[in-house]
Amino acid sequence: MATEHEEKLGTEDSKWLGEYSQVHMNVFGTPLRVMDHGQGAHIWDVDGNEYLDFLAGIAVNSLGYAHPKWVKAVADQAAKVAHISNYFASEPQIELASKLVKLAGAPEGSKVYFGNSGAEGNEAALKLAKLYGRTLPGALPSIGGKPARILAMTHGFHGRTMGALSATWKPGIRKPYDPLVPNIEFVRAGDKVALHDAFAQTGLGRYGKGPVAAVILELIQGEAGVQPLGADYVKFVRELCDINHALLIIDEVQTGIGRTGKWFAFQRDDLSGGVTPDMVTFAKGVAGGFPMGGMIAFGEKLAALFTPGSHGSTFAGNPLGAAAGLATLDVIEDENLVANAEARGEQLRDGIMATGNPLFVSVRGRGLLDAVELKHPCSHAVMNYCLEHGLIVNAVAPNALRFAPPLIVTAQDVDQALAILKDVPTDLPDD
């Protein structure tokens, strides 16, 4: 028997999806639905079907949809000035940078670079790391030095632009674009011996490599299935970086801005081991749905390596995006949404296992970045079942579903999601 959603699908979705396929390059596949409007944690498609959104634009819509304070801030700024060139600055841009430095607990002299996406934030971090690498003794041409290296993790994801892609593990999206940026190497995530060996390859001899300028990692590897890297391992990375004068770059594109129950995931000792990074990248949730990303360089000496002309973007830190970012951070503070992320995430994880559904083997995650491990690789079938029953989730891996609800999600919203998850059939087909 068809569900209510199945019966209502068709007319408007079919019309718009047909046109979509005619005018859009096929980089995302066929969209699941054509969406029209949202409110809070709920969104409606063009056929009028309502969905509880437990993906939030992949951890982007921190405040859900149409939060009145966010809408007002963006509208007010648009009525003043939406964009100025980077020959000028704006008050929202300056205020947002100051606030991010403060929330990150970065030391005096730390500075922010704004871009428009997570990939751009990571591009900035990688470029700054390369500039830093040129200052290392083992990389100096005058003594026969070799180009400094950047180490990245297997299964890590940092973006699809050429530099960020060079530090992204997934072979399927890397290989078509070979050769990528040189001197970026992968080490097995969580493997201390492999990391030690990678550092130990530094040397001026015939078989030696250039010094390690930086290590880039995610504390929770989101695209790998919401897999925490491990606090003990991260602490070890920091120790090796310190010994070898290398930078630690923590990619918080998905984990930052309150999502894991702290403003930044590195502020959770159970994820970071209490380490402090040299750079943090951010995006997704920072502006509540407006395209924005960036990087924080910790300390004046590192931040000073970027000089006029060394990096930039036309739209970086534009007033409209900055106003959206300020409104997002203000609402997160005013409504205590960091604590809500912690509480609702615990409710979700505990509730999934309490459903008694034998399809659900285990849960993992922090705050409102979570995953459930499935008994067999049927994540796409589960995702489609949930969608048909009014719940948006993500098939992040064959055996795992990802949840990243807006930070404004309520206990009632979580209960509604759990009621749908409880009834997911156990005999759905494998992907």
From Swiss-Prot:
InterPro entries associated with the record: AcOrn/SuccOrn_fam, Aminotrans_3, Aminotrans_3_PPA_site, Class-III_PLP-dep_AT, PyrdxlP-dep_Trfase, PyrdxlP-dep_Trfase_major, PyrdxlP-dep_Trfase_small
Gene Ontology molecular function, alphabetical: identical protein binding; N2-acetyl-L-ornithine:2-oxoglutarate 5-aminotransferase activity; pyridoxal phosphate binding
UniProt keyword list: Amino-acid biosynthesis, Aminotransferase, Arginine biosynthesis, Cytoplasm, Pyridoxal phosphate, Transferase
Organism ancestry: Bacteria, Bacillati, Actinomycetota, Actinomycetes, Bifidobacteriales
Cellular compartment(s): Cytoplasm
Protein known as: Acetylornithine aminotransferase
Organism annotation: Bifidobacterium longum (strain NCC 2705)
This protein's encoding gene: argD
Similarity comment: family membership: Belongs to the class-III pyridoxal-phosphate-dependent aminotransferase family. ArgD subfamily.
Miscellaneous section: May also have succinyldiaminopimelate aminotransferase activity, thus carrying out the corresponding step in lysine biosynthesis.
